[in-house]
C-alpha cells in the first residue's frame, strides 16, 4: 500500500541505500559486509510488518527459550510475497522468471524464523506463481486469500 516501506525514506535507511547501492542486491548486504551488521536492516525490520523478522519473539512455551516466528496476519504475508517478487524482478532484471522468488525462498528457508502457517501460505503463493504465472497468482490471492478485500 501507500505506506509500504515508508521507513526507507528515513535517514538511517536512505543513507545506507545511497552509499551501498549496487543494483544487483540489497544495499543492506553490502553494509553488513563492510561493518559487520546492517544498521538500515535493523531499523527497517522493526518498522515493517511484512518482514518475517518483525514477527520474531520468544516462544510462549515457558519450556522453550528460543526465538520463534509468530503467526503473521495474512495481509502481511501477501505483502511479503509481493515484496519478494518485486525484489526478485529488480535484482534479476531481464533474466527474471516467475520461479525465481520460490527458488530464492527455498535456498534460505532453513534460516527463517517463520511460523509454520505463515510459511505454508507464503510457499503456496510462491509455488502458484512459479507454476501458473503472475496474472493467475494475483487473481488467486485476491479471491482466495484476501477474499476481495
Residue ranges, per PLM feature:
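Metal-dependent phosphohydrolase cores
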Residues: 1-149
